[in-house]
Amino acid sequence: MSSPLRTMISRLSLFRPAHTRYAAAAHFHATSNCSGARVAVVLSGCGVFDGTEIHEASAILVHLSRGGAEVQMFAPDVSQMHVIDHGKGQPSETESRNVLSESARIARGNITDLAKLSASNHDAIIFPGGFGAAKNLSTFAIDGMDCEVNKEVERVLKDFHKAGKPIGLCCISPVLAAKVLPGVDVTVGHEEEQGGKWPYAGTTQTITALGAKHTVKDVTEAHVDQKNKVVTTPAFMCDTKLHLIFDGIGAMVRDVLKLSGK
């Protein structure tokens, strides 16, 4: 092995034990010596078509860091519904992947099984979007309003809600709250496609069919259900520029932190 390559690998710390390697990785999503809100972020894999929407997750982490939050990331230890070749946009017939392992890519290795998440240890919880929310955290992508929500996802949503702690959701993930929390008021954006700007506008009909309320919001806005302490924003439910989605997620994060009282 050449000296430059050996040096690069050493700097990347690939040969260090995992427990020491991941300690440094934690700084990607946690503020050192932080006295702010303790926020759990729940991932659903890695990649928009079969897991977490990576831009949304990154935006959430940036805004949480800016807000002084201490972040811990979680994902369920389950198999993905399927694996999508993101270059071809097609399912891979020969691959299977684990949601927890794939989510670790975004978390830089510092990830915890969702089964270990306790609402008593956190002040708020946030769910990024991506099709993983509809495929791995629930069966919404297949079953619509008749979907089932992963038992651990359902548990933590109910636990945070019962404890009066804020819940943030973006993109398609508000359907999880609509299914689990009766009468919750959420947004996934607009209720008409508007020439393709809102390609998933039909989701609003399913939300209302579940007994939840839908409030129209633009992509840069967040909607706050004060009664249930649920904060939502459309994110990539809108076909628009990335910085606008980033701004909307920022609004959601700020409202979540405000509701946490930290």
Swiss-Prot record:
In which domain of life is the source organism classified? Eukaryota
Keywords carried by this UniProt record: Mitochondrion, Transit peptide
Transit peptide start and end: 1-8
Which cellular components does GO assign to this protein?
mitochondrion
Gene3D superfamilies for the chain: 3.40.50.880
Cellular compartments annotated:
Mitochondrion
Among InterPro entries, the record links this protein to: Class_I_gatase-like
Q: Which family does it belong to?
A: Belongs to the GATD3 family.
Name of this protein: Glutamine amidotransferase-like class 1 domain-containing protein 3, mitochondrial
Provenance organism: Danio rerio (Zebrafish)
Q: Which gene encodes it?
A: gatd3
